[in-house]
Amino acid sequence: MTTSEQSSQPTYGIHLKRDVMIPMRDGVRLATDIYLPCHGDGTVVGHTEKVPALLIRTSYDKTAPEWDDVFPYYVRRGYAFVIQDLRSRFRSEGDGSYFHTANPWEGDDGFDTVEWLAT
């Protein structure tokens, strides 16, 4: 069992970029919130060096309060936490079904998002 001394400790603050509109290959833009670790002086870690990222794509509203207990744990430990509304859901653009099996853009949208984040 891991003790608190062995696990990572929260060392960063949190910087939020709300509703970043990430373009997909067909021109539709998906609303994305990006939480980045920052230093005590407010300098965003992701601007000066690459950080690992956790990506969640949801049809249940990226601003739902349930996420408020999730993202701080990771961001304070140096991860970027990225959460995106699926195509045609909430703040994202596009027409289409939000059911994964019926949405023909789902795979491409996920791929395009990862590629955008990696640049």
Which residue stretches match the model-derived regions?
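Cap/lid segment of the alpha/beta-hydrolase catalytic domain
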Residues: 38-118
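N-terminal cap/lid segment of alpha/beta-hydrolase-fold proteins
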Residues: 3-49
